[in-house]
Regions:
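Terminal domain-start segments
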Residues: 1-34
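Short, hydrophobic/aromatic-rich segments at coil-to-beta transitions
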Residues: 15-19, 39-44, 99-102
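Short beta-strand segments that buttress and anchor functional surface loops
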Residues: 19-22, 45-50, 103-108
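Short hydrophobic/aromatic-rich beta-strand segments that constitute the beta-sheet cores
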Residues: 21, 31, 43, 67-70, ...
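Short consensus segments that form the blades of beta-propeller domains
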Residues: 21, 48-54, 114-119
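Structural signature of eukaryotic scaffold interfaces centered on beta-propeller domains
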Residues: 28-38, 88-97
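Mid-length scaffold segments of soluble, non-membrane domains
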Residues: 38-73
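Short aromatic loop motif centered on NTY/YTY
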Residues: 69-138
Length: 138
């Protein structure tokens, strides 16, 4: 379908509780409905910029699209304490088939002696399961 900017938005995946849209070649949005302990749900949205390294932002909403505090539902996600001596990106992806989340932290640390010297990039992958209304590290 044509979006408001004149580009094409593609719905790439759709299940009963998950959707993935590509708005441009370099941006996507994932949405997942996650059950709470009562009969309600929260909606998890992950916005990701794909170039040059994927970098994501996660938000939560109630069933009426009112914003909810992210720290309540994903308090242990990595990458929130990014220091000035390292550059990091956090790529978050939701599972279309299960209430799980994959968080990949990519970072490079630069030496202070030479701005052009880069230490070996490090990548860390974390898996989270949705349990009792919050994402919990496996």
């Amino acid at each position: 379908m044509t979006n408001r900017l004149g580009g094409t938005t593609i719905l790439s995946a759709l299940t009963d509780d998950y959707a993935l849209w590509h708005y441009t070649a370099s941006s996507q949005v994932e949405m997942k409905r996650l059950p709470l302990t009562d009969s309600t749900s929260v909606i998890c949205l992950v916005h990701t910029v794909l170039l040059p390294e994927p970098d994501s932002h996660i938000d939560f909403y109630d069933e009426h699209w009112q914003p909810l505090p992210t720290e309540h539902y994903a308090s242990t996600l990595p990458g929130t304490n990014r220091s000035s001596s390292s550059l990091s990106t956090l790529h978050i992806s939701l599972s279309p088939d299960a209430p799980t989340l994959k968080a990949e932290l990519h970072w490079e640390t630069y030496t202070m002696k030479d701005e052009n010297a880069v230490l070996t990039p490090a990548n860390e992958t974390y898996w989270y399961d949705w349990k009792e209304g919050t994402f919990t590290l496996r």
